[in-house]
Amino acid sequence: MLKNLFRKTKYITVSQKNIENYKRENTPTIPDGMWVKCNKCGEILYQNDLEKNYMVCNLCGNHFRIGVKERIKYLFDKDTFKEWDYKIKTENPLDFKGYDEKIEHIKEKTNLSEAVTTGKGKIAGMEAVVCIMDSKFMMGSMGCVVGEKITRAIERAIKLRLPVIIFTASGGARMQEGILSLMQMAKVSSALAKLDEEGLLYICVLTDPTTGGVTASFAMLGDIILAEPDALIGFAGKRVIEQTINEKLPEDFQKSEFLLEHGFIDKIVPRSDLRKVLAKLINMHQNSF
């Protein structure tokens, strides 16, 4: 009797495999990419709602970085954009180790041929030549192909008598191409000088981030310079400047709002209003002749 009283209770052994199967079968399946966390306010956002709102957080107004496809979708009249020069191939002029492999890997990953896409399309029925930089391709860095594509686009705009709009998003010159990369600053700036001589409109839209050699050249040469809210815009990094001058810089230093306040840009335009504002500017310029 006492022996039965203190007998060890029998229990069922559940294998780890059964536990994992149970969890898998009873856990709701949520597809990847359905929810996105806002990196400014921390709110979890539904991807479809975010896309309908131009990739802008509806709670804090944070403008997510967007690529070429989204920019074309939000800017142009449907099915009017025609891409130019997408077959120009990136070379390795300095035989920089690993550069060829890196370019091929990024091409496959992003489905982009380079850090800028150029072409012609219609905005509210009006034609314009547009260059769109994409930070997903080597941080939008400017190499020989980027400079060549933008220069060709400007030259075609002169022949077609069309305005030029450039959306900047770049970390600056591409170090793997050395001095040839830096040369693109002068090359694009020279083409823009010819555009100006022809009396044609150049609008630059600064997006997050616009830095380095791009800022030091064509990004700041626009007849009209627009920017998206809270965009990082500058030449050298904030910490580099602070270490150089041994001073603490303002918290909002190099933000588009700071630049507007100090007269470096003309207007900050929310993404939802950008198409309307650009159409108005193009129309005003066309009607002034």
Swiss-Prot record:
Catalysed conversion reaction: N(6)-carboxybiotinyl-L-lysyl-[protein] + acetyl-CoA = N(6)-biotinyl-L-lysyl-[protein] + malonyl-CoA
Alphabetic keyword roster: ATP-binding, Cytoplasm, Fatty acid biosynthesis, Fatty acid metabolism, Lipid biosynthesis, Lipid metabolism, Metal-binding, Nucleotide-binding, Transferase, Zinc, Zinc-finger
GO molecular function: acetyl-CoA carboxylase activity; ATP binding; carboxyl- or carbamoyltransferase activity; zinc ion binding
Xref: PROSITE patterns: COA_CT_NTER
Pathway stated in the Swiss-Prot or TrEMBL entry: Lipid metabolism; malonyl-CoA biosynthesis; malonyl-CoA from acetyl-CoA: step 1/1
GO terms for cellular component: acetyl-CoA carboxylase complex
One BP term from GO: malonyl-CoA biosynthetic process
Chain ranges of the CoA carboxyltransferase N-terminal domain: 34-289
Zn finger intervals (C4-type): 38-60
Binding-site residues, Zn(2+): 38, 41, 57, 60
Enzyme Commission number(s) from the entry: 2.1.3.15
Domain of life where this protein originates: Bacteria
Cofactor note: Binds 1 zinc ion per subunit.
Reported cofactor(s): Zn(2+)
Pfam families: Carboxyl_trans (PF01039), Zn_ribbon_ACC (PF17848)
Compartment(s) where it occurs, according to its Swiss-Prot or TrEMBL record: Cytoplasm
SUPFAM superfamilies, per the entry: ClpP/crotonase
Function: Component of the acetyl coenzyme A carboxylase (ACC) complex. Biotin carboxylase (BC) catalyzes the carboxylation of biotin on its carrier protein (BCCP) and then the CO(2) group is transferred by the transcarboxylase to acetyl-CoA to form malonyl-CoA.
Subunit record text: Acetyl-CoA carboxylase is a heterohexamer composed of biotin carboxyl carrier protein (AccB), biotin carboxylase (AccC) and two subunits each of ACCase subunit alpha (AccA) and ACCase subunit beta (AccD).
Family: Belongs to the AccD/PCCB family.
Protein name: Acetyl-coenzyme A carboxylase carboxyl transferase subunit beta
Protein source organism: Clostridium botulinum (strain Okra / Type B1)
Gene this protein is translated from: accD
